[in-house]
Curated annotation (Swiss-Prot):
It comes from the Bacteria. Pfam families: 5_3_exonuc, 5_3_exonuc_N. Mg(2+) binds at D109. This is Flap endonuclease Xni. The keyword Nuclease applies. Belongs to the Xni family. SMART domains: 53EXOc (SM00475), HhH2 (SM00279). HAMAP family: Xni. GO terms for biological process: DNA replication, Okazaki fragment processing. The gene is xni. One of its GO terms (molecular function) is 5'-3' exonuclease activity.
Amino acid sequence: MAIHLVIIDALNLIRRVHSAQPNQDDIQAVITTTTRTINKILKETEPTHIIAVFDHHLQDRGWRAEILPQYKEDRKPMPEALQKGMDDIQEAWWKLGIDSLLSDGDEADDLVATLANKVAVHNEQVTIISTDKGYCQLLSPTLRIRDYFQHRWLDAPFVEKEFGLKPEQLADYWGLAGISSSKITGIPGVGPKAALEILTQFPTIEAANESEDLPKKYRKKFDEHYETAILCRQVAGLRTDIELGFNLQDIRYEKGTRDYQV
């Protein structure tokens, strides 16, 4: 039987639902809304396997902050009411047949990337449910990303329209242009348009740096900030080598075994 693994970026979904609630202390409303959302996702995707990946709730910013100390340094903590309600949310999702993968220091995106890659490389179908465009660097013929809230696929045509690049160039793009929301600086003075110009001419940061054809207007910037660009690319990239501690059989979706109705 063909495999279709659905991976839910849990906090990406939960935080958006929570922020839309009139009373953000009402965790039951979050549970009700997210379970309805999950039921719709199950109906639309028809997974054979499914898991929800949760980020750790601590302020530890992980290995990325060791490389770039300013990485997400102003990240707001999870609202207290939501943090206290996480166990209840996970329990409600469990009753729908969805197990949770809880990170222990690793960022959820690396756990998602590792699991998605492990399955996709065997030519099995993987769908990531998230609005996070960072996952687009993982795109492959059998790996896709669904933005549930905008009802769109974050696929190769989306990447071409949004960035003008191939998915495999996105980490280099962010290494050059940076990601302001995460305090990934990139090369000062190289914004999205310049990064696109460079990566249209050269496939990678290294290729651009090593070429005598790099436009003069960028040469000084590269000479002064090349190492920063490499570090920023590393931080913007996704790890796919995290030890997960379970196998695919453990997250097989069995419809109705833990039925939870709303």
